[in-house]
């Protein structure tokens, strides 16, 4: 009996349909020119947790549940007296997703999390950085199914950066549209 290795839905869709659609749309001559997803970076600023390290731990735990891997605590580089901040205090958390976990997260983001956002009218299509990377923000981390609403102590916002190998914003937007990103413009 041959074991079938599990492959995420969006990864198999990319190989089967999206690569061909991108090659046809942009008339690439080489397979390696076709843009693909490189990584997804999740960043959660937890500046309110400076005074309470327990809040920082719950934020790290929530980000770990959302991402499926352990986040790195980002620390303050220098002290700022006005914010009661000391060098080395935890001020955020970040995690970088690659390979299968990246495709799994993207699938949950597009199919489950974004439709659960209050008053969601679509994503801003102008949030590209000029090099084919897309950045977006969420005001609440409660939209993810891994977070239990009853056990939440505080609502955190988060930044999501989708990095692609696309050379231009136009190519990156076409790639993300193929992945069913709901752009408004």
UniProtKB/Swiss-Prot annotation:
Assigned GO CC terms: ribonucleoprotein complex; ribosome
Any one GO MF term held by the record is: structural constituent of ribosome
Highest taxon in the source lineage: Bacteria
One GO biological process this protein is involved in is: translation
Disulfide-linked positions: none
Do you know which PROSITE patterns this protein is assigned to? RIBOSOMAL_L5 (PS00358)
**Sorted alphabetically, which keywords does the UniProt record give?**
Ribonucleoprotein, Ribosomal protein, RNA-binding, rRNA-binding, tRNA-binding
Q: What does this protein do?
A: This is one of the proteins that bind and probably mediate the attachment of the 5S RNA into the large ribosomal subunit, where it forms part of the central protuberance. In the 70S ribosome it contacts protein S13 of the 30S subunit (bridge B1b), connecting the 2 subunits; this bridge is implicated in subunit movement. Contacts the P site tRNA; the 5S rRNA and some of its associated proteins might help stabilize positioning of ribosome-bound tRNAs.
Q: What is known about its subunit structure? A: Part of the 50S ribosomal subunit; part of the 5S rRNA/L5/L18/L25 subcomplex. Contacts the 5S rRNA and the P site tRNA. Forms a bridge to the 30S subunit in the 70S ribosome.
Read off the PANTHER family from this record. Answer: 60S RIBOSOMAL PROTEIN L11-RELATED
- Which NCBIfam families would you find in this protein's record? PRK00010.1
Report the family membership: Belongs to the universal ribosomal protein uL5 family.
The molecule here is called Large ribosomal subunit protein uL5
Organismal lineage: Bacteria, Pseudomonadati, Pseudomonadota, Alphaproteobacteria, Caulobacterales
